[in-house]
A protein has these predicted regions:
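Conserved luminal/periplasmic juxtamembrane motif of membrane-embedded glycan-processing enzymes
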Residues: 2-725
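Extended, hydrophilic extramembrane loops/domains of integral membrane proteins
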Residues: 721-735
């Protein structure tokens, strides 16, 4: 084994060991990740996918959501992505945990391999991989699985794209297309777009320098740039072919879903990255903490109107990375301007509504169905880590200019932290902090204490890095590398723990006690979780202000989409991922228009049409808090009110013609009808009586034994209509 290979083996082993130690409790199954979409969406929906497959069907259709919704065509489910299939292991919980954790290792190892292919030596590549795989942006993706699954393959995609552009070989073309194709199989659009932008820009960069390296006029660079971009286009075509199983149905689904409609600009610009987040690259807790003992202490929530917290929890990749990036600005290495251009593009997109650019894209019809601009910070962070790793490699070679520039930056930022830490001894700090973040006196107490601690830690962090850089010429190189690695690990570990807190395993594997009020056989009915719509009402504000108990409230109240984990079917729920079919959206809009009409029993008719037997509403907060003795993790925030047991399949006893959705709402809000009424856009008729003797459903089929008595009947099926449904009567197709 060569020395270089030995160093690589050691580096890979340590990277794997560090990741395993950081997430050991998740690996062993004693705890699990729970933040945000993990609890409310991914853990339950992956169970649905697993159950459908294990029952011998292809997951075309998900009966649990909104009266039925496409599954395989919706990229949110990652049906065709190979690592999703880990959920088919005998233990679902183990498979679910592994299909998240494996991407941490892929990100770490892929980044290390990319840096090594760029002639960065093992120590610098190791620290660069740590800064990426255990950095703030990448670990923020753990609760955003489609983005995590795409971003994990970004380093390997770039590795083989770069190799091909430098020395074209079919093998590298194939591997670049394959790894990009894996991103298409996941189908997360913004991450795929960022990958495409990154490799496309790199192709232009390589073409430009192909002419410059031969001292040719700039006009010779144009054909070089275009030829390389053409190769990227060919790779993209090949990658789309790899991901065609997901891309073709996804594109088809878009036309029939919420994504076919223009989003309001307020939704498109939501979660725009605030300018203040730049400071997070130096001071990781400048804006607050995502989780301390399962409580969010994010004092800059006002910078995210309507959201209260960031989409990307942190952009911090380590103080060493930031210092080396700043040093690169001063020493102006080859590729430095290219990285600055990438950063400028990335930041312009990530700032979203804070600049006129997003408004321009929106009005031009380009950015009308893409949400949350903060996602686009990935390009900048990725490029910065690559450049910083190269600068570290030069520093280890004894480049004094880089060391001095980094030393100066660290000294300046440490002095700022020191001055602020000293100001904490004066009464002005509390007033200024509260004024800056808009905090009232009652809310500022614990936050102020945290903020004071953060600035002291920032002072210590900066002091340690300053000492490391100052001691560099005075220490043996291997000792300095070990100390630098320990510093980076110590710097990033608290962030990794804070961004991904855990819950005990029984949080997911146990069942909420409220389920005891529901029948054991849950196939014949659906639930309408009305309470989930009232996030700004007083009961919701009280229940969701219970600190460390907030996610227990979600779990114990079986808030959507958690009911599907307990074999419950939902209807009239919120479309969280904006992928619901258009008839579902129209029906939900009609339900809320009906409520706004002032009708007292507004929910009765929609529940009858939807086969909903139970309606979830909030319990009064104060009596429930008293009942559990203040231990809100034991609270049952929701009570399910049992209504009439409306069937899923029935014959209408009354038919009414409507012109459109608004006419439907008007008639419901002013009239009184049978619970078996049918509203149709075709001419109405007096339907004959009919009987549904029995019905049987699988994931993709429904078989009914029905009888129409004495004439032409009208069978109502409470299932979301879709263009690919096929209906037969006695074996004969019907329109």
């Amino acid at each position: 084994m060569t020395e270089a290979r030995r160093h690589d083996t050691i580096a890979i082993a340590i990277l794997g060991l560090l990741a395993s130690l950081l997430f050991l409790d998740v690996l062993l199954g004693t705890h699990n990740f729970y933040l945000r979409d993990l609890t409310r969406y991914y853990y339950p929906t992956k169970q649905v996918l697993r159950d459908i497959i294990l029952h011998g069907e292809f997951p075309y259709w998900n009966r649990h959501f909104g009266g039925g919704q496409p599954m395989a065509a919706n990229p949110e489910h990652e049906v065709f992505y190979p690592l999703t299939w880990l959920i088919l292991l005998p233990s679902y919980d183990l498979g679910y945990r592994l299909h998240i954790l494996v991407h941490i290792y892929i990100g770490l190892f892929g980044m290390y391999a990319l840096l090594r292919s760029m002639a960065v030596r093992a120590p610098a590549a190791f620290l660069g991989a740590l800064s990426f795989g255990l950095g703030g942006v990448y670990l923020s993706y753990i609760n955003l699985l489609p983005i995590l699954f795409c971003a994990a393959w970004l380093p390997l995609t770039c590795l083989f794209v770069r190799r091909f552009l430098l020395r074209p070989r079919l093998r590298d073309f194939a591997l670049a297309s394959f790894f990009l194709g894996l991103q298409f199989l996941v189908g997360e659009p913004t991450t795929v777009m960022q990958t495409g932008l990154l490799i496309g820009m790199y192709a232009l960069y390589r073409g430009w320098y192909a002419a410059r390296d031969h001292e040719l006029p700039w006009t010779f660079a144009i054909p070089e740039m275009l030829s390389r971009v053409a190769f990227i286009a060919l790779m993209s075509v090949a990658a789309i072919a790899v991901g065609a199983a997901q891309m073709i149905p996804a594109i088809d689904h878009v036309r029939d879903s919420a994504r076919s409609r223009v989003f309001e600009f307020s939704l498109v610009s939501a979660w725009s990255m605030p300018w203040a987040k730049f400071a997070e690259a130096v001071y990781p807790n400048f804006l607050g903490h995502m989780s301390i003992d399962r409580i969010t202490w994010y004092w800059a929530g006002g910078l995210y109107p309507g959201m209260g917290s960031p989409f990307i929890f942190s952009i911090y990749s380590g103080l060493l990375v930031t210092a080396l990036m700043v040093a690169a600005i001063f020493v102006r290495p080859r590729g430095g301007r290219f990285v600055l251009i990438l950063c400028a593009i990335s930041l312009l997109l990530a700032l979203g509504g804070h600049t006129p650019f997003l408004q321009f894209l929106y009005k031009a019809g380009i950015a009308t169905s893409i949400r949350y601009p903060e996602k686009f910070i990935l390009i900048a962070v990725f490029a910065v880590i690559l450049l910083a790793s190269q600068m570290l490699d030069r520093l280890l070679d004894g480049d004094e200019d880089i060391r001095q520039a980094a030393l100066g930056f660290v000294a300046a930022t440490t002095m700022v932290a020191g001055v602020i830490a000293l100001s904490e001894l004066t009464p002005y700090y509390n007033r200024t902090f509260s004024w800056l973040w808009g905090l009232n006196q009652s809310a500022a107490g614990g936050i102020l204490e945290l903020s004071r601690r953060d600035w002291v830690i920032a002072l210590g962090r900066g002091g340690v890095l300053f000492a490391l850089l100052w001691l560099f010429p005075r220490l043996r190189r291997r000792l300095w590398i070990v100390l630098a690695a320990l510093f980076v690990v110590a710097d990033l570990t608290p962030i990794s723990q804070e961004l991904n807190p855990r819950m005990p395993s029984d949080f997911f594997t146990g069942q909420p006690s409220i389920l005891r009020v529901l029948p054991a056989d849950r196939k014949p009915f659906r639930i309408f979780h009305e309470a989930d719509w009232y996030g700004q009402e007083q009961p919701a504000k009280k229940y969701f202000s219970t600190g460390a108990s907030v996610y227990w409230i979600v779990r114990n109240g079986v808030f959507p989409m958690t009911p599907v984990a307990y074999d419950l079917n939902m209807v009239i729920e919120r479309d969280y991922d904006k992928t619901a079919l258009l008839p579902t959206l129209d029906f939900i809009d009609s339900v809320w228009d009906l409520k706004r009409s002032g009708r007292a029993d507004w929910w009765a008719a929609p529940m009858a049409m939807s086969n909903a037997w139970y309606r979830g509403v909030y319990r009064p907060f104060d009596p429930e808090k008293k009942r559990v003795g203040g231990r809100m993790e034991l609270a049952e925030p929701i009570q399910f009110l049992e209504g009439e047991h409306h069937p899923r399949y029935y014959f209408a006893d009354q038919m009414l013609t409507i012109a459109n959705r608004h006419d439907f709402v008007r008639q419901l809000s002013t009239g009184s009808y049978s619970s078996n009424v049918a509203f149709v856009t075709a001419p109405a008729f007096v339907p004959a009586r009919g009987v549904v003797h029995s019905w049987r459903e699988t994931a993709n089929t429904a078989a009914l034994d029905v009888e129409s008595i004495g004439g032409k009947g009208f069978l109502v099926m409470s299932v979301t209509p879709h263009k690919y449904w096929r209906i037969t009567v006695d074996g004969r197709p019907v329109p």
